[in-house]
Regions:
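N-terminal signal-anchor/first transmembrane alpha helix
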Residues: 1-22
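Periplasmic/extracellular loop-to-transmembrane helix junction in inner-membrane transport proteins
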Residues: 24-70, 208-211
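Transmembrane-helix boundary motif in ABC transporter permease subunits
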Residues: 64-94
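Generic hydrophobic transmembrane alpha-helix motif, especially the helices
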Residues: 95-131, 138-139
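Transmembrane alpha-helices
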Residues: 122, 126, 158-191
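Short cytoplasmic-facing helical segments at TM-TM junctions of multi-pass membrane proteins
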Residues: 135, 139-174
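Hydrophobic alpha-helical transmembrane segments of polytopic membrane proteins
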Residues: 202-241
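Short cytosolic juxtamembrane segments of multi-pass membrane proteins
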Residues: 241-247
Length: 247
């Protein structure tokens, strides 16, 4: 409860500071609308089917990207973490690809995939892969050898050890990787919508608000909603980890 109260106090302090800056003569009124204006516009936008369509498009594409990233990264991490030969053979390629920012791949993705949702989903998958993959590998590195030896004593084969011993032990690490990947994928998703000419999504909403009549209140509405989605994802996955895989 104390942590929750402190969190509320931190949010309240941030909003008060924002309100003061927004109404201060130090900044032009149109450059930083105060939260009282932004949240009023947020209420208006939440009644707009068009805005809801943008939010749903981003959230749906984000969920698809996370599911695809999990489907690729977890099996790959299990293989790389349990088969040293494969890990050594792929290390150079992985270390080359991992530092490349997803946004740097936008031109290539547009040429290959066009301007549809496939582009933002693919780039979000690329960004989300790495935290899940490396957390899975790390989890297998930390696997207690005693658990493996005990399973083998009872006649469990290599695949059985992998799926019934290694994977359950790795789940807390994997879920932490998914939590990190979800917020990273959200950042990439909105960035691609903003930069790659998407026709729907929060990034597109922000771009339209900024490039049209310069409605900074709408720009900040899109930004706030993206932040709220990130907080809900992060807190939801953390609660799942604590409740179901806290071992």
């Amino acid at each position: 409860m104390r942590a929750f109260t402190r969190g509320l106090l931190g949010i309240a302090g941030f909003l008060v500071l924002w309100e003061l800056l927004g109404r201060s003569p130090l900044l032009p009124a149109e450059s930083l609308p105060p939260p009282s204006v932004v949240f009023g516009e947020l209420v208006t936008q939440l009644t707009s089917p068009d805005f809801i369509r943008h939010v749903v498009a981003t959230v749906l594409a984000l969920l698809i990207a996370i599911v695809i990233a999990i489907a690729i990264a977890v099996p790959s991490g299990l293989v790389l973490g349990s088969v040293p030969a494969v890990r050594h053979a792929t290390r150079a390629v992985i270390e080359f690809l991992r530092p490349i920012p997803s946004v740097a791949l936008i031109p290539l993705a547009l040429v290959m995939l066009g301007f549809g949702p496939e582009t933002k989903i693919t780039l979000a998958v690329y960004a989300a892969l790495w935290p899940i993959l490396f957390n899975t590998i790390y989890a297998l590195d930390e696997l207690d050898p005693l658990l493996v030896d005990t399973a083998r004593v009872f006649g469990t084969g290599r695949l059985g050890v992998l799926f019934f011993v290694a994977l359950p032990s790795a789940l807390p690490f994997v879920l932490t990787g998914i939590r990190l990947a979800a917020t990273t994928a959200l950042v990439v998703m909105v960035s691609v919508e903003l930069m790659a000419g998407s026709q729907v999504g929060l990034g597109y909403f922000i771009m339209e608000a900024r490039s049209g009549p310069g409605r900074m209140d709408q720009v900040l509405v899109g930004t706030v909603v993206a932040g709220v989605i990130g907080v809900l994802l992060n807190n939801g996955l953390e609660r799942v980890r604590r409740r179901w895989v806290a071992w």
